[in-house]
Each structure stands twice: as C-alpha cells, then as structure tokens.
Amino acid sequence: MKTTKSFIIIWTFIGFLLNLLALFTPFELPLFDIADKTNTTYLRMGISFQVASNLFISCVSGATPAKYAQILYLIIGIFGEPLYMTGNSYDMTQDPSWGYVIGSFGASERAGEKAFEKKLSLLNILISSYSGLFVIHAYGAIGLLLHSKSWEHWKSYLIMYSLIPLPSQLVMIFLTSILAFLFRKILD
C-alpha cells in the first residue's frame, strides 16, 4: 500500500475519530435466549474499544498514521477532555495506568510495522495485533511498577489493570483483527 501525505493525514483523522468513538462504546457480547425470542441481553466485558481502535488503525494504515492519531488523542486529553479511563490533563501522569497510555504509542509502532512487513494474511494481522497488545501491557506493567510503593501494590495493580481486562481484550483483538484484514483486502 502506497503511503502519501494525504493518505497519512486522512488515516490520522480516521484513527483519531475512531479513538473518540471507541471511548464511549463499551465492548458487549450479545446473549441470545432461545426460549425468549423477544429479548436479547448483553454481557458487559468491562472495557471499551480504545485498544482495538488503536490496533485496527495500526494494522490497516500503518505505524505513522496510528501514532499521529494517538498523539492527537493525547493532546486533546492533556488539554482538558476526559478521554482516558483515569481522567485528563497533566494529572493523569500521576495515575498508575499512565504506562498503558504511553504503551499505546509503542503498540501503534509495533503493530503498524509488523502488519506491513509480510504479505497480507489474517495470521500476520493477528500476530501484529497481539504483539501490539503485549506492548501495551508491558509498558503498563512497567508504569505500575514505577508507581507502586511495594511488591504487593504492584501485584494488585497488575491484576486490576492487566489480568482482569485481558480475556476481554483477547476476544476483542481477535474480532478487530478479522475486520482489519477485511479492510486491508478491500484497500489493496
């Protein structure tokens, strides 16, 4: 895929808008009741689509537009809009989850480069997305370690910020990777 300046600008804004939309969209799975055909209930997974939108843009457009979209998103968050789970402004650097925010930049880079280094395949997109998720959690774990007062605090933070949301994120990244693969097929 040829990346021109206009391509980068367009995908940067698409990524930024997807990040904004993802913030307000919880990840829920429908549960169908065969006996009651009128009601569909939804299982709340406890996370939003922020990680998925970041990795989707990385796998579809590459590392550069995804990083620029994350930078725009961070700038808006710093200047007062509550775009992150932990709030906004410069105070968010004092939150234990700050490492995950920084990790989103590394994830954009890793997933975006990996998605384009080999021929397009679903397996390559899946590996790219999951490696990006790993980068987010690695940066997050380091940030938690730096923020923790003790080993016990770090373990409890790690459970709260990484282990509890991880199963939902694994499912969400799988579904997002399929969507990214289909988009890449259309764009190629």
Swiss-Prot record:
Gene Ontology MF annotations: biotin transmembrane transporter activity
Protein name, entry field: Uncharacterized 21.2 kDa protein in psbX-ycf33 intergenic region
Annotated compartments: Plastid, Cyanelle
Superkingdom of the organism of origin: Eukaryota
Signal peptide segment: none
InterPro entries, per database record: BioY
Keywords: Cyanelle, Plastid
Upper classification of the organism: Eukaryota, Glaucocystophyceae, Cyanophoraceae, Cyanophora
Taxonomic source organism: Cyanophora paradoxa
Pfam families given in the database record: BioY
Cellular compartments per GO CC: cyanelle; plasma membrane
